[in-house]
């Protein structure tokens, strides 16, 4: 049970153990893309969030992933994007795109603040 107020009703608030510390993030699943207006409202809520500083969007397809991630390209918050199918197979090793550093990297690196990149074909997000 959470004992703090959050700005948005997220699909889940997840806490994982990384090495010597815990990392908490908001998890959102996007099966289909929303309108730009809806995403503008969501981005505003996430920008105003004070209790959570990391966010993960998992998408059902490449088309949805591109649409969702593009809406957050100017966000000042740490929002990462990946595929639900990868999450099921790899969990913390899921490759996520991170607009803060404009690269793909393992989710565990994104949660720990590491800037370690991974190699992904350049056309993946072209």
Regions found by a protein language model. Give the residues of each.
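Non-catalytic C-terminal interaction segments of nucleic acid-processing enzymes
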Residues: 20, 33-126
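Active-site metal-binding core of divalent-cation-utilizing nuclease and nuclease-like domains
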Residues: 1-25, 31-35
